[in-house]
Amino acid sequence: VLSPADKTNIKSTWEKIGSHASEYGGEALERTFASFPTTKTYFPHFDLSPGSAQVKAHGKKVAEALTNAVAHLDDLPGALSTLSDLHAYKLRVDPVNFKFLSHCLLVTLASHHPAEFTPAVHASLDKFFSSVSTVLTSKYR
């Protein structure tokens, strides 16, 4: 459960990310594909080379979904219900992949905002990404 302090940290960090969210989403996906090659199997139709327009476009979708989640921290299941259905029933993404992407999102954000990435912010973002992952995999059960 996200505490009031977590919610404050998440919202303030996301405001600082601002217009870079889509860029960071693409970068995090590239990191995920490089670090966890099995994740590529869900994107056989994509050009997965660094800087790929398709990876950037999907990174933008990831960033938009996370921005929506940040705006609805008190109702993540409601905000992410459609995405949960998509990933569980249509795409059938292995739940571990959300953990991989979450890790790569943390690395990406820390590399671009080292001064703001305090232990408290790190912990809050980790809890947020974990909460999002839990919601996205909730319909697998």
From Swiss-Prot:
PROSITE patterns: GLOBIN. Coiled coil: none annotated. GO terms for molecular function: haptoglobin binding; heme binding; iron ion binding; organic acid binding; oxygen binding; oxygen carrier activity; peroxidase activity. Signal peptide: none annotated. Transmembrane segments: none annotated. The keyword Transport applies. The modification N6-acetyllysine is found at residue 16. InterPro entries: Globin (IPR000971), Globin-like_sf (IPR009050), Globin/Proto (IPR012292), Hemoglobin_a-typ (IPR002338), Hemoglobin_oxygen_transport (IPR050056), Hemoglobin_pi (IPR002339). It holds the Pfam family Globin. Red blood cells. Residues 1-141 form the Globin domain. The modification Phosphothreonine is found at residues 8, 108, 134, 137. Keywords: Acetylation, Heme, Iron, Metal-binding, Oxygen transport, Phosphoprotein, Transport. The modification Phosphotyrosine is found at residue 24. The modification Phosphoserine is found at residues 3, 35, 49, 102, 124, 131, 138. The modification N6-succinyllysine is found at residues 7, 11, 16, 40. GO terms for biological process: hydrogen peroxide catabolic process. One of its GO terms (cellular component) is haptoglobin-hemoglobin complex. O2 binds at residue 58. Heme b binds at residue 87. Involved in oxygen transport from the lung to the various peripheral tissues. Belongs to the globin family. Heterotetramer of two alpha chains and two beta chains. This is Hemoglobin subunit alpha.
